[in-house]
Amino acid sequence: METLFEVAETTAKAPAKTDQLYSNLEEYKKIINTNPKTKWVKANPYANNALYLPIGIVEELLNKVFPFWQVEQHGEPKIIGNSVVISVTLKVWHPILNQWLSYAGVGAVPIEVQQGAHPTDFTKINAKALHKNVPAAMSFAVNNAAKKIGKLFGSHLNRKDSEI
């Protein structure tokens, strides 16, 4: 049986069956309320070194903890100010509760314009900006939704006081 701390050690292998990770609600709560491994956590130099989990880690954790999960995008990407904004619902199948659980998430990424251009001068958008900014906003939205599941998914990474 894989322990909580070995959950992502097998990311190169096939996903573990969730019944190997938890068999009751208390075990599930223990898993999702454990801090992520330090080696998974990265600092974002563009956001005052805010800590985050890369989307690849989040997706592997979703694969390990839940038998099924899916992302539903709400409408089309929106442009607000100079950013691409995407809203999603992350749905995970909880095998103990025998139901889908839903978590809302929003992601935004500034649209890249040519150096020196005003951020909202859309005549100066870099050629491939939206090609990479839209998927990045989607990744941030999924990551934001997953944080709501628990500490394992990064919910407490940037909190000063997280103990009750």
PLM regions: where:
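Positively charged, aromatic-enriched nucleic acid-contacting surfaces
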Residues: V58-I164
